[in-house]
Swiss-Prot record:
The protein's role, per its UniProt record: Cell wall formation. Catalyzes the addition of glutamate to the nucleotide precursor UDP-N-acetylmuramoyl-L-alanine (UMA).
NCBIfam families (UniProt xref): murD
UniProt keywords, alphabetically: ATP-binding, Cell cycle, Cell division, Cell shape, Cell wall biogenesis/degradation, Cytoplasm, Ligase, Nucleotide-binding, Peptidoglycan synthesis
Coiled-coil stretches noted in the UniProt entry, renumbered to this chain: none
Protein name: UDP-N-acetylmuramoylalanine--D-glutamate ligase
Binding site for ATP: G110, T111, N112, G113, K114, S115, T116
Organism expressing this protein natively: Synechococcus sp. (strain JA-3-3Ab) (Cyanobacteria bacterium Yellowstone A-Prime)
Keyword Nucleotide-binding: yes
Pfam families given in the database record: Mur_ligase_M, MurD-like_N
Pathway assigned to this chain's UniProt record: Cell wall biogenesis; peptidoglycan biosynthesis
Length: 469
């Protein structure tokens, strides 16, 4: 009797190694085939784990448990068949749970802002001299942390886990643990429609997010989000944060951060490094979680000073000076839905040349489209969604757009457009931003938003290099 792992992403790879380290019989299956997957296949097969690539999923004889990577739908036909046969089906995060349940957790979920909030919390623990491992949907998979903890290679004080709706959907036992078990603190960053093609309804999507807070001892919610502001009274022991309301547990007054009425830090430098009100919201959420975990204000202050931002989230990757005009290239590949695309545009000053598109998600693009109309000088569209996005823009009478075949071409065309725009500026010293903020998933052309962001960075740096020759 063995264990079958579906998906050979980093989570599936780690889950297989955790099972094998316990002496269990493991098979891994992935319907895709690529050079990266073959490298992982070779690594696992050296550890005695058979791997099947490039074949449709099928249940193997003698399997007693199927472990599901986050990218595989929880209602996949193979999983439905496994359940009919009485085979246990668990998510990768749940597999890690028995090895980590003795530790306190900060669990962080939400539509947008999860990763930055998670990284900020981990930084606050680090400055306080505690190892709070950022993991889950960011950094290390939970099963990798579980393996290293079980083997004695790590002794973390806390787990700081970003948990996606996919992971929460597949972690029912984790979320039904006895009262008082981790997560000690549950954080809900934002809530807007996303992943409806997988979860079906907004109510189901919200339900998976709410699981985390229902099990937590303490909860932190974003009072700037209307849905979460309404729900803040649904649970006891709930902190809420606000950019302006002094009744909140954590709030801003001017540029000063207050926690429980006490001034903690000035945020001018942070706002310069991490632009946008959404990043201030992320910081307030992280500060609230750290405070509840007993992190002193001095460590929170130190983390605010040292935090440099996150890759693929309004990350400035290059700058080219054209006369007096700086042209800045900003990588916001993590913007995989319309809300995140709106947040990026709202955080930046015009003029902006926007590169958008990819694989469209369900959702209402109207607010994003209106902000494009108000702030964006030109839109360059790529990927599967390009024709539909072009039509939506034309319907609001926005016509300064172009559909292009690849990101490489879009970066080159964006630079040409920026150079032309620079000549027409009233203030030649005014920066122009070339922004990759797709508002779409990456899977039509890339393996992940990180893959897309790395490619954008490489294109920009190659452009800079060609101009220096």
């Amino acid at each position: 009797m063995g264990h079958q792992v579906l998906g050979l992403g980093i989570a599936g790879w780690s889950a297989a190694r955790l099972l094998r380290a316990q002496g269990k019989e493991v098979w891994v299956w992935d319907e895709q085939d690529s050079e990266l997957l073959r490298q992982r296949q070779a690594e696992l097969e050296r550890e005695g784990i058979p791997v099947h690539l490039g074949q449709p999923f099928q249940l193997l004889p003698g399997v007693k448990q199927v472990v599901v990577s986050p990218g595989i739908a929880w209602d996949h036909p193979l999983l439905q068949e496994a359940r009919r046969q009485g085979i246990e089906v668990v998510g990768e995060a749940e597999l890690a749970w028995p090895f980590l349940e003795h530790l306190p957790w900060v669990g962080i979920t939400g539509t947008n802002g999860k990763s930055t909030t998670t990284a900020l919390v981990a930084e606050m623990f680090k400055v306080a001299g505690l190892e709070g491992i950022p993991c889950g949907n960011i950094g290390l998979p939970l099963s990798q942390v579980a393996l290293e903890t079980w083997q004695g290679r790590r002794q973390p004080a806390w787990i700081v886990a970003e948990l996606s709706s996919y992971q929460l959907e597949a972690s029912r036992h984790l979320m039904q643990s006895s009262p008082g078990s981790p997560p000690r603190i549950g954080v809900w960053t934002t809530f807007t429609p996303d992943h409806l093609e997988r979860h079906g309804t907004l109510e189901r999507y919200a339900g998976f997010k709410a699981r985390l807070l229902q099990r937590a001892q303490w909860r932190v919610v974003n009072g700037e989000d209307p849905y979460l502001f309404r729900r803040r009274q649904d649970w006891e022991n709930t902190y809420w944060v606000s950019l302006q309301d002094p009744q909140a547990d954590v709030f801003l007054r001017g540029s000063t951060l207050y926690i429980q009425g006490e001034a903690v830090a000035e945020l001018e430098d942070f706002a310069e490094r991490c632009p946008g009100s959404h990043n201030l919201q992320n910081l307030l959420l992280a500060a609230a979680a750290a405070h509840l975990a007993g992190i002193p204000n001095t460590a929170i202050q130190g983390a605010i000073r040292s935090f440099a931002g996150m890759p693929h989230r309004l990350e400035r990757v290059a700058q080219i000076q054209v006369g007096s005009t700086p042209i800045r290239f900003v990588n916001d590949s993590k913007a995989t839905n319309y809300e995140a695309g709106w947040v990026a545009l709202n955080a930046l000053s015009p003029p902006i040349i926007l590169i958008a598109g990819g694989r469209a998600k369900q959702g209402d693009p109207s607010a994003w489209l209106r902000l494009i109309q108000a702030k964006v000088a030109r839109v360059l569209l790529i990927g599967e969604a390009a024709p539909a996005l072009a039509q939506a823009l034309q319907e609001i009478r926005y016509t300064d757009l172009e559909i292009l075949p690849t990101l490489d071409v879009a970066v080159e065309r964006a630079f040409v457009a920026a150079c032309s725009l620079a000549q027409a500026l009233d203030n030649p010293a005014q920066p122009i931003t070339v922004l990759l903020s797709p508002a779409c998933a990456s899977f039509d052309q890339y393996s992940s938003f990180e893959h897309r962001g790395h490619h954008f960075r490489a294109c920009c740096q190659a452009l800079v290099g060609s101009l220096e020759c």
